[in-house]
Amino acid sequence: LCSLISWASSTSAQFIPGLAPTELENLGDGLYAFRAGGYRNIFLVTSEGVIVTDPLSSDKAKILREQIFTITDQPVKFVAYSHSHWDHVSGGQIFKDEGAKVVAQERCATNIKETPHPDVVPPDITFKEKYSIKLGDHSLDMHYFGPSHDDCMVVMIAKPANMLFVVDIGSVPKGWFMEYNPTMPDDNLHNMPQFLRATEALMAREGGETVVSGHLALDIGDDGSMTPAASTGPAKAIGDKALFWEMLFAFVRDEMERGASVYEAPDRI
């Protein structure tokens, strides 16, 4: 089921009648969401420049740059990576060539060095646990809570909008919606509940109420029809997703304690 939902959300988005290939959404307070196919990033427009998150790909980054220039003539000063997977962080060279600095958690630099891709720009600035990119009266705060979808994924809070940007590990508005491809070899499922609970606590401390997803989620009707879900959702979705993992681990543990093998447990659950 999770494979079907992941495929439906990322690949089939292009087949939804009336769904534009790209979309630009003004979220307020200088924060914008850009969607290309089933992928989404956010960017902040400030009086001193623009902060862009995941460039998505070389082709998508060109469209993103054009969209930014319809809003402001300020240059892109920073590109922030959510993690190290190529399908999100490819394409930053167009911004690097214009002087932007790339920011990522320190393990992303190692991953990119060990598994290079010609379209992935290595980070210029790395950090361990937290880094805040500040331009004008805006900031993008990057937080690392340990390994999750890869070993360098971060969540980001855009201010003053105070919205959380989350990639791959969950898609709002429904916290129960499965993340994208949980079978990735560098997924660290053991830490997923802790990562999400730490993110939930962060939102509580910051007073944030809204989450922006790094992927387009789809509402699937009883007849199999698919309609695009909203790009934002309640912070509660983070806690719901943490609960999903906690319950799943508990079910697996209970079944294995009853004698189920790793092959039998999924069928029993």
Regions found by a protein language model. Name each.
Residues 1-7:
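Bacterial N-terminal signal peptides
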Residues 8-13:
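Boundary at the C-terminal end of the N-terminal hydrophobic targeting segment
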Residues 49-50, 57-59, 132, 139-141, ...:
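Metallo-beta-lactamase
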